[in-house]
Amino acid sequence: MSFDPVHGLSIKELNAVFFSTFLITNMQTQKSNVFVNGKVLSLHQLTGQSAHDALAEMKRLSLDDHKKTRLPGPNPVSIEKKDLAKLRSGYVISPKTDGTRYILMFTRLYNYKVVIIVDRALNVYLLPLQIVPRNLYQGTIFDGELTVAKSGAPTFVLFDAVVIAGVTVSHLTMGDRVIAIRRSLRSFRTHEKDPAVLSMKDWAPIESANVKARLKVSEDMYHTDGYVMVNVNKPVTYGRDFDFFKVKPHDKHTVDFIVMDAVGTLGLFDPNVRQNVPITKYDTTKSMFLIGTIVECSFKNYTWVPLQMRSDKTEANDVLTYQRTLVNIEEHITLDDILNSIKA
């Protein structure tokens, strides 16, 4: 195969083609389809030692000393009425994007620059962005969500940052982390060959007079399923964060169960016994899932109904999450409840 810059490819694009080809042929990868909001992205998934090394690099960059490998970021809890008073001090709010949570990592692997995304099941994919600021490859981890904008464009929405260009920022306030993200991406440019567009999540001070207008701008751009609220004064927490809240519409509450047997038993993780325990059953005449599959279910007519398989997860929600979801369904907190609590 020969390339000629005169016939449509610049030297930079030639280098990008060569680099992408080199990575695919020198790393352990397999072609994989990633499903996002009904759209299919064709990416290369790292396998074997290559995936292991990428995850080890993520753990190293994030300074995470947890015994297990996990995504370096917080997991929100569903807000309850008893939590509303917390929102009066230092919180921002944004629509909850309906997509799949990923870590976006820029680093060097085997001495070559790579852009990688990692989901909660620790699946690792190459995301070949074309025009990236060079210093990001010194080691950068962004937290975000892969979604499809209402325009139809696959989009990676950036929430937060752990480390940028080799400098740890997870200990900073959220405002400083957002400033650092924006500065690091000033020379980033979207390219027509990028598999996804990068976008910044808009966090609005929850007490601001125009908060509803700002929320609507994001809701007009993306498919959303509720709201998330973050304390701006806290550093990044790895794992469950009891000061990071989410709220969903009454008909959007879901729980991720694990299929425990062939007769439809659905279970959750019970930390007291350190294993999955049966909770409910689903109707196997309407759908069937393999044992061990994580299935997202919604609560309809007093029963849990499967919505979709969660290929991005390998573990069920725990019993605490389930119990709090039942409280959420009963309390039925709305956006107006949240905003009115700030004025109280």
PLM region spans:
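Short, low-complexity, polar/charged sequence segments that are solvent-exposed and flexible
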Residues: 135, 163, 175-179, 245-250, ...
